[in-house]
């Protein structure tokens, strides 16, 4: 199966072509400031990487992905990707099926099935990037909870309304360090 794959992050979008169980033609571009710019970049990369054998597009993204509604809910460092029928819009643009899942869930699921957690019935995965995310896997399947926020450790309130991401993500630590040195 051939897919064009994207990993949408707060600072960059990584991409590649999944073909024959491997990813090739890898690259990245800075995360755009607007949804229109994002679509232009995604379409450009898709055009470069896809061929007649491409069956779909797979995307990992921040936020609480509601696959039934086709919407990325919640909040992230990329506010313009939330709270609209993003999957429908992307499928219309690419002309192929699109699957989106939370970035930490993608990483956690891969670890639970192929990595360090493959011999465990329960695993927890933390991801540190622009924010802090995570995933909970039970019996090799994602646990999202009733509100899709299972594993979203970055939203935990630590003190006085400050979240774990606001306090301890790599970006927050760098900002706080620079602020304290000024």
What is each residue range found by the language model?
Residues 44-48, 92, 179:
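A generic structural signal for well-ordered alpha-helical segments enriched in polar/charged residues
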Residues 32-43, 56-57, 64-122:
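Glycine-rich phosphate-binding loop and adjoining helix at the ATP-binding site
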Residues 61-63, 146:
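Short, small-residue-rich loop/turn micro-motifs
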Residues 16-19, 24, 28, 35-38, ...:
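Glycine/GP-enriched mid-protein hinge/lid loop-to-helix segment characteristic of carbohydrate kinases
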Residues 11, 104-105, 149:
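A generic "binding-loop/recognition-motif" signal
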Residues 3-61, 68:
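Conserved phosphate-binding loops in N-terminal lobes of ATP-dependent enzymes
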Residues 13, 106-108, 133-135:
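Short glycine/serine/threonine-rich phosphate/pyrophosphate-binding segments
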């Amino acid at each position: 199966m051939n897919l064009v794959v994207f990993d949408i992050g707060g600072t960059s979008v990584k991409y590649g072509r999944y073909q024959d169980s491997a990813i090739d033609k890898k690259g990245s571009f800075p995360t755009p400031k607007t949804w229109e710019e994002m679509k232009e970049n995604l379409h450009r990369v898709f055009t470069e990487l896809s061929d007649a054998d491409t069956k779909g597009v797979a995307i990992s993204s921040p936020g609480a992905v509601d696959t039934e509604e086709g919407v990325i809910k919640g909040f992230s460092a990329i506010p313009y990707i939330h709270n609209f029928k993003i999957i429908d819009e992307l499928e219309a643009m690419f002309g192929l099926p699109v699957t989106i899942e939370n970035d930490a869930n993608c990483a956690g699921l891969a670890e639970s099935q192929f990595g360090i957690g493959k011999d465990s019935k329960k695993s927890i995965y933390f991801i540190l990037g622009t924010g802090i995310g995570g995933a909970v896997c039970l019996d090799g399947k994602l646990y999202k909870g009733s509100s899709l926020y299972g594993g979203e450790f970055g939203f935990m309130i630590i003190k006085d309304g400050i979240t774990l991401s606001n306090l301890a993500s790599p970006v927050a630590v760098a900002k706080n360090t620079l602020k304290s040195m000024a």
